[in-house]
Amino acid sequence: MVEAGDFRRGLTIEYDGQIFQVIEFLHVKPGKGAAFVRTKLKNIKTGAVIEKTFRPDERMPLAHIERREMQYLYNDGELYYFMDTQTYEQIALNQEMVGDALKFVKENMTVTILSHNGSVFGVEPPRFVELEVIDTEPGFKGDTQTGATKPAKVETGAVIQVPLFINVGDKIKIDTSTEEYLSRV
């Protein structure tokens, strides 16, 4: 059992007899009245997203989720193919199931496939990835403003904000959960 006040992004719960994944949550403490937790929940079977408000002390059961490490093989334009590195079993998932999870994932990287009762519902990328910058504006001498950033395109096609000293060809470390630059490698 988990209390609504302990919700985190990615947590899976049972609610109204169905399995939901917490997409967003916000703890609200109004000036007057009791605190509450405003959430966006995604039904893992149908993909439907609902908004629901809970009291922070409201309890609900956690859903048991199976996690399998698999290697991302390729995308044929329609489906994404993954392989279990121990059994060599391959599965194909559509864009709806994958979502933005592969935004920072190259072919042959290891990802986590999420399933419930044998039914796959999502993909979790590795927490940190190292990618090469393929396009960005050059940094100029004197661009030393604190915290200044510029857009940079990495080899997977995703665009993130990076510090001004990053150039084309640099390898950078990215946190996939926040989609933020961490360091130069």
Swiss-Prot record:
Pathway field: Protein biosynthesis; polypeptide chain elongation
Biological process per Gene Ontology, one example term: peptide biosynthetic process
An annotated GO cellular component: cytoplasm
Transmembrane residue ranges: none
Compartments, as annotated in UniProt: Cytoplasm
Sorted UniProt keywords: Cytoplasm, Elongation factor, Protein biosynthesis
Pfam families tied to this protein: EFP (PF01132), EFP_N (PF08207), Elong-fact-P_C (PF09285)
Coiled coil spans: none
Gene3D superfamilies: 2.30.30.30, Nucleic acid-binding proteins
Presence of the UniProt keyword Protein biosynthesis in the record: yes
InterPro entries per UniProt: Elong-fact-P_C (IPR015365), NA-bd_OB-fold (IPR012340), Rib_uL2_dom2 (IPR014722), Transl_elong_fac_P/YeiP (IPR020599), Transl_elong_KOW-like (IPR013185), Transl_elong_P/YeiP_cen (IPR001059), Transl_elong_P/YeiP_CS (IPR013852), Transl_elongation_fac_P (IPR011768)
GO molecular function annotations of the record: translation elongation factor activity
Family named by the database record: Belongs to the elongation factor P family.
The protein's role, per its UniProt record: Involved in peptide bond synthesis. Stimulates efficient translation and peptide-bond synthesis on native or reconstituted 70S ribosomes in vitro. Probably functions indirectly by altering the affinity of the ribosome for aminoacyl-tRNA, thus increasing their reactivity as acceptors for peptidyl transferase.
Name of the protein described by the UniProt record: Elongation factor P
Lineage: Bacteria, Bacillati, Bacillota, Bacillota incertae sedis, Caldicellulosiruptorales
